[in-house]
């Protein structure tokens, strides 16, 4: 995936990019995002995830580890294909479904299935949702919940 040429601002951030603090957030959520974006930009992609491409272009983040890990990238794409098919099939049969995507990270499946569900809830840890909310402004039928699925409350 090509990186845009940009300049640094006074804060040491790339102009036009958003730097995210990964403190307390699993970096794998950005690596999986990058894998989907990189696949989408191939000449003959196995999946299409325009939201991932849009977010990666806005991020000031070093994706060199994700670029080197072909096995991880291929696994992400295989998992995306399988889960998109399973979710799509279910939603085709249950158009009034309410979906809860637990440990969503930067998953964008809700956008790839827009119009095929009644409501969609993306749930993850507060630290993760803080990053997600900077790039995905979800409202209407898509909601974000910052909580642990392990909490009893």
Regions found by a protein language model. Name each.
Residues 150-153:
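Short loop/turn elements that flank and shape the SAM/SAH-binding pocket of Class I
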